[in-house]
Amino acid sequence: MKYLLLIIHVLLFGIVNAQNDNVGIGTVTPDASAILDVSSTDKGVLVPRLNTIQRMGVANPSDGLLVFDTDYGCFFFYQNASSSWLSLCNQA
């Protein structure tokens, strides 16, 4: 019985401890300051692509939400302080 409790304790500790780690894709040593560290020498990151109607239709967007608007060919992020989508291209 003690052995079973020890195994359960070790497994639960591992699960709880894993929740505090960061994730590395393409790297075995993710940067400690990042929750997600993506590394590649020949690929990029593809963020969600929406047209303007889809972007404006996002229900309750989170502060800092990033999308690529295919109508403008530009990145937009949502800012709660202004309750609006802000362009990163200064064209919209």
Language-model segments: which ranges?
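C-terminal trimerization/auto-chaperone modules of long, extracellular attachment fibers and adhesins
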Residues: 3, 19-92
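Sec/Tat signal peptide C-region and signal peptidase I cleavage site
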Residues: 14-18
